[in-house]
Regions:
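Compact beta-sheet-dominated globular domain cores
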Residues: 213-223, 229-254
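Short Lys/Arg-rich cationic patches that frequently serve as NLS/NoLS or arginine-rich RNA/DNA-binding motifs
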Residues: 188-198, 282-295
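Core residues of folded domains in eukaryotic genome-function proteins
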Residues: 154, 211-213
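Short linear, low-complexity motifs centered on an aromatic residue
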Residues: 246-270
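N-terminal processing/targeting junctions
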Residues: 127, 177, 182, 243-244, ...
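Short, surface-exposed beta-strand/loop "edge" segments at domain boundaries and coil↔beta transitions
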Residues: 163-168, 178-179, 221-229
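A surface-exposed partner-binding patch
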Residues: 2-169, 174-176, 205, 252, ...
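Intrinsically disordered, low-complexity domain-flanking/linker segments in eukaryotic proteins
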Residues: 133-141, 177-207
Length: 295
């Protein structure tokens, strides 16, 4: 088996705003190192062609503060802000030669600041399977002025180029428990509102706009799945999966489709083994929950 590209230490799945702030300058430098490692890895793989990486000049402080004023009370997480200050958006694409034909295959992208725009998002979801033990209390939405109920969670588009669904930076969501060190078990936290589909929110405490936002994925069936606790973790996962088609589905109930699995098996078999092992753990946990519920 060919080794995965060297990406440094695995991201912490339960990172919070304070830890994120302390790590943000280092995280932005690590993002550059990770990108270079993946570029080298891709160029070394037989059949990979036309590896293209583009980035923009960093966003200025005035631009970053303007975004926060425009979308108040939401604030950019420190790691994402540090990334945007170095590179205001990025895109890495590559093609694959297969049976004598070269075609686009991998794509990794982070929106520029101006494209991190609000996404429509319903609130007050519940776990659709009734598995409340899958969810834990997370950052919560802010209280609406003059009311005793929490305002809706908010979401912003993180990757407008994703054709497999929507990648969102979500404020005030409830994250799943049991997430692995790199967020691999995040699919256990799929939740939806009865009558709608969105990340769960809580009204118990705190202000979601002040907390570290998480990264969620909405698949083409409109189901939301937790990806990572921080932007830094998401960036590392994106690179670990080489931007292969439908890689986000490794974190959903649907899982990877057969074609995606074939590409993973060829280009990064270790990653596929991890995905399959985590899915097996998830299925076993689901069986145990059903047995407990039947007692």
């Amino acid at each position: 088996m060919a080794p995965e590209p060297h990406l440094g230490a695995a991201p912490a799945g339960g990172g919070g705003a304070t830890a994120n702030a302390a790590q943000s300058p280092q995280s932005s430098l690590q993002a550059q190192e990770i990108t270079q490692g993946v570029l080298s890895y891709l160029k070394s793989k037989p059949g990979v062609r036309e590896v293209r990486f583009s980035e923009r000049a960093g966003a200025g402080t005035a631009e970053l503060r303007l975004w926060e004023r425009t979308h108040a009370p939401c604030k950019l997480p420190d790691d994402l802000e540090a990334f945007l200050a170095i590179s205001n958006g990025m895109q890495l694409t590559w093609e694959m030669e297969f049976r004598g034909e070269v075609r686009p295959l991998g794509a990794m992208a982070i929106n520029s600041l101006e494209d991190i725009k609000p996404l429509p998002l319903d609130t007050w979801p519940v776990d659709d399977d009734g598995n409340d033990d899958e969810l834990r209390a997370g950052p919560t939405a802010a209280q609406s002025p003059g009311t005793d109920r929490a305002a809706p969670v908010r979401a912003f588009c993180l990757d407008a180029a994703c054709s497999a669904g929507r990648v969102a930076l979500v404020y005030g969501a409830v994250a799943p428990v049991g997430v692995g060190s790199d967020g691999r078990r995040a699919g256990t936290g799929r939740a939806k509102r009865k009558g709608s589909n969105s990340p769960a929110s809580s009204s118990n405490a705190g202000n979601g706009a002040d907390a570290c936002p998480q990264v969620w994925f909405q698949d083409l069936g409109c189901q939301w799945s937790f990806i990572s606790a921080t932007f830094s973790d998401y960036f590392r996962l994106m690179m670990m999966h080489l931007g292969l088609p439908h890689w986000h589905y490794a974190f959903t109930e649907l899982g990877l489709d057969p074609v995606a699995k074939q590409w993973f098996r060829y280009l990064t078999p270790e990653r596929l083994a991890i995905i399959q092992a985590e899915r097996t753990k998830k299925e076993k946990a689901k069986v145990k929950r059903k047995k407990r519920a039947a007692r």
